[in-house]
């Protein structure tokens, strides 16, 4: 029995609250059960130097955890004077995932920065960040159209992510912290709304997993992501 009585293929309740803050062009509070992340999308005119003159835009991301988002307090990385390797890995993942959602040529020379700040962590903070940031990005892009900066919205479709893993020999979807910490296999999967894979991060924490188990986990992830995308679209329709 899973901690919340969920079936193995069931994601936690997902909530997406749009326009959560007033200054950013897009802002979303995303909740996967007890994991809560504030995602904002900020638009700037211009692109990084390596893209100047190429007529395309750029999407980048930053990720951080509030000191008491976890069971015990972690010092802010700013106080330590440098970002940790995990932080850099996750923010690059978020940016790669969201670039797959946008036609960067159609975006033109704008840069959109996605800031994902974890308010409370209970497993799956990177997958929640991608899911929430995609909705914040959609709102920001629509603002560019409404303000006459773009003729058409360059969003190609939704992108979402979910964790899957093997715990006590069983494949499960959307791991909470207690499940994640006990997982024999831990995997994060990012997909487009039509089920194409953007990224798979999978690690055998204990026993190596088989090819068949990999396919089972990917199928679980696709089912979970279909449910999450439906929630994203419902949030954007309101």
From Swiss-Prot:
Q: Which parts of the chain span the membrane according to its record?
A: none
- Give the catalytic activity: tRNA(n+1) + phosphate = tRNA(n) + a ribonucleoside 5'-diphosphate
Q: What is its EC number?
A: 2.7.7.56
The answer to whether keyword Transferase applies is: yes
One example of the protein's molecular function in GO is: tRNA binding
One GO biological process term is: rRNA catabolic process
Signal peptide positions on this chain:
none
Coiled-coil positions are none
**Is Transferase found in the keyword set?**
yes
The alphabetized UniProt keywords are:
Nucleotidyltransferase, RNA-binding, rRNA processing, Transferase, tRNA processing, tRNA-binding
Q: Which InterPro entries match?
A: ExoRNase_PH_dom1, ExoRNase_PH_dom2, ExoRNase_PH_dom2_sf, PNPase/RNase_PH_dom_sf, Ribosomal_Su5_D2-typ_SF, RNase_PH, RNase_PH_bac-type, RNase_PH_CS
- Source domain of life: Bacteria
Residues that coordinate or bind phosphate: 86, 124-126
Q: Which CDD domains match?
A: RNase_PH_bact (cd11362)
Protein family per UniProt: Belongs to the RNase PH family.
Show the HAMAP family listed in the entry. RNase_PH (MF_00564)
Q: How does it assemble?
A: Homohexameric ring arranged as a trimer of dimers.
Q: Which NCBIfam families match?
A: RNasePH
Q: What is this protein called?
A: Ribonuclease PH
Q: Say which species the protein is native to.
A: Shigella flexneri
